[in-house]
A protein has these predicted regions:
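Extended polysaccharide-engagement surfaces of secreted carbohydrate-active enzymes
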Residues: 12, 26-183
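Active-site lining segments of carbohydrate-active enzymes
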Residues: 1-28, 32-35
Length: 183
């Protein structure tokens, strides 16, 4: 969407996408993981992001000149991808390999494609902000559209959700005021 908005010079769309990207960044954990514990498709999610999607790097990089914190998000997520890769294969989570859970080749080639596209972008001459929203201790944030609360207290990060939208497969995500993630 960012690429289209920039190419088409659609400032209305770019403003909308920019707001959406800033909100999404609220859900990145301090170690570069994406918290989609509350989402209707959280069963298709991994600790480092979407199982099969291209991810966020390209769009965030395209907007990094205006938002240096996006470079920090990309850096942290790449570090997390390195930690969850073994023998050239990307595992679905931090402890999958040591737990004997085999990697999925689809994760590997899906993200290799996205990272390759990202690496072909021209370098930016800006400095990362070094701080992301969930690095800060802020107490409680509420996201009305998804009826979800983020908590940041001391070293703890938590997500509570009352998001009761159903996906076509019933019972696939936490609902009704559940603790969906504790970090």
């Amino acid at each position: 969407m960012v690429y289209y908005a920039l190419m088409a010079k659609d400032t209305d769309l770019l403003t909308l996408v920019d707001r959406s990207m800033a909100t999404h960044l609220e859900f990145m954990l301090p170690d570069g993981a994406w918290d989609n514990s509350w989402g209707t498709r959280s069963f298709k999610w991994t600790y480092w992001g979407g199982r099969t999607s291209d991810g966020f790097m390209g769009g965030y990089y395209a907007m990094a000149a205006q938002h240096p914190e996006y470079l920090e998000a990309i850096h942290r997520n790449i570090q997390l991808l390195k930690k969850t890769t073994s023998e050239g294969l990307l595992y679905g989570g931090m402890h999958y390999r040591v737990s004997g859970i085999a990697p999925c080749i689809h994760h590997t080639f899906g993200h290799a494609k996205a990272i390759t596209s990202f690496l072909e972008l021209p370098p930016l001459n800006i400095t990362s902000s070094q701080e992301l929203p969930r690095d800060k201790t802020y107490g409680l944030k509420y996201f009305k559209d998804i009826h979800t609360w983020l908590i940041s207290q001391g070293p703890w990060r938590a997500t509570f959700t009352g998001y009761d939208a159903e996906y076509k497969i019933k019972g696939t995500h936490p609902m009704g005021g559940a603790l969906s993630m504790l970090w």
